[in-house]
């Protein structure tokens, strides 16, 4: 859906989607599935900071509504929700590495943050927080590099506790840059030609994000396993029912 919703921004300035995602996911953990629901937006003439504000407003609105209208259900789950304060804290990838080094984590620049590191950050920040400015090689080909430092991207992840809830950023809207990034990631641009064709006619600058619905439910309900908040979970070991 990612590539299709980007195309749609050339016609509709604001694109919203709630849909099933299917992924060849190799990870077999308590927070990964091969089929899941994603909540997505894509906005024309927007940057990462703009859609980050939309994301935090959505999270706060949902938490507030659940807290006010689902008191008995939350009590049954033994869950007390606190409405997060806006704006959410923002730290860069570099700042995250520095914080983790102070807690004896040794992560080289350009490496992804492993689960133990995310758990430690979740202990330090007790509310949702953004990690921004991720290295270029850690993000998909359609994420825009920063003009002042192309090794870094205009990207963000939204974390809460130890979970990554959402990921997004400013998108590349020029075909030549997309082709360059595809080749950089050892992908064949010819296989993406139906997508790239639309960029020949002019694509507006755009930004967006996708949020894993079940992971958000995990945070709301306090469950530790994504299968507890999913009807008929499907992972690498289970497809039926």
Regions found by a protein language model. Give the residues of each.
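Metal-assisted phosphate- and nucleotidyl-transfer catalytic regions
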Residues: 57-161, 184-203
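A generic structural motif
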Residues: 40-51, 162-164
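Active-site lining segments that contact anionic ligands and/or coordinate catalytic metals
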Residues: 13-15, 36-38, 126-128, 153-155, ...
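A residue-level signal for conserved active-site and pocket-lining positions in enzyme catalytic cores
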Residues: 11, 41, 96, 131, ...
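Hydrophobic/aromatic-lined pockets within catalytic cores
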Residues: 8, 12, 23-27, 59-67, ...
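Class II aminoacyl-tRNA synthetase-like tRNA-binding/catalytic domains
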Residues: 1-44
């Amino acid at each position: 859906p990612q590539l299709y919703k980007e195309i749609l921004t050339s016609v509709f300035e604001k694109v919203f989607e709630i849909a099933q995602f299917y992924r060849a996911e190799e990870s077999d953990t308590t927070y990964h599935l091969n089929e899941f629901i994603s909540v997505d937006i894509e906005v024309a003439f927007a940057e990462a900071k703009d859609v980050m504000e939309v994301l935090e407003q959505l999270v706060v609105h949902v938490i507030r509504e659940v807290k006010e209208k689902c008191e008995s259900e939350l009590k049954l789950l033994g869950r007390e929700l606190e409405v997060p304060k806006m704006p959410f804290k923002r730290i860069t990838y570099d700042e995250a590495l520095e914080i983790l080094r102070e807690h004896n984590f040794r992560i080289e620049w350009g490496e992804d943050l492993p689960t133990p590191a995310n758990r430690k950050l979740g202990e330090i920040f007790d509310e949702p927080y953004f990690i921004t400015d991720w290295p270029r090689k850690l993000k998909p080909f359609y994420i825009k590099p920063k003009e002042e430092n192309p090794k870094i991207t205009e990207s963000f992840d939204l974390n809460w506790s130890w979970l990554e809830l959402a990921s997004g950023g400013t998108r590349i809207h020029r075909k030549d840059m997309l082709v360059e990034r595809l080749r950089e990631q050892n992908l064949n641009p010819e296989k993406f030609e139906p997508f790239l064709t639309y960029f020949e006619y002019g694509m507006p600058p755009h930004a967006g994000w996708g949020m894993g619905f079940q992971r958000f439910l995990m945070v709301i309900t306090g469950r530790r396993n994504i299968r507890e908040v999913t009807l008929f979970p499907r992972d690498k070991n289970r497809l039926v029912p």
